[in-house]
Amino acid sequence: MKDSRLDQFIHRIKAQRACLNMAARLVAGMDGPILELGLGNGRTYDHLRELFPGRDIYVFERDVSAHPDCIPDAAHLLRGEFKDTVPGALARIGAPAVLIHGDIGSADTSRDAELAAWLGPVLRPLAAPGAVILSDRELGAAIWPPEPLPEDVAPGVYFMYRAVALA
């Protein structure tokens, strides 16, 4: 029997939390900001604030509609389409990020694939050496090598990469 959409959502959110918690451990000794691509309801942003107290967390969002307690201040919110806000964002954030998280999936899988194919290369200059990149869509091993997922996360549910120089 196929999982219901609710079950699929729960699996994805549990995977997201497990990956974020693992990423927090992996970057604990590194300096730099956190990037959140897509604010949505603000749940992940809120979790990132818990994981990284005192760190700058920059959020990229087209249409802010999150819970009021989960909206970053204007200095940390890059409002607009990713294609307008992500390229050149390094000037605004001031330093490469140690963690980049993208929750970019939608019901339109062809749009998601196109966005992920574009996004992977554009994120390279925003990632510090050794940064962790997480996404609910595959960004491509040609951009960064895959990082092992937490043992309770099924392959294909979430994607984790490490920013290293590729030959």
Predicted regions and their residues:
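Class I SAM-dependent methyltransferase Rossmann-like catalytic core
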Residues: M1-P33
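A generic alpha-to-beta junction signature in SAM-dependent methyltransferases
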Residues: A28, I93-G94, L126-A127
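Class I SAM-dependent methyltransferase core
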Residues: E36
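Glycine-rich SAM-binding Motif I of class I
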Residues: G42-D46
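Conserved SAM-binding motif I beta-strand of class I
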Residues: R55-E61
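S-adenosyl-L-methionine
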Residues: D63-G94
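Short SAM/SAH-binding signature in class I
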Residues: A95-G105
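C-terminal substrate-binding/active-site "lid" region of AdoMet-derived donor-dependent transferases
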Residues: S106-A167
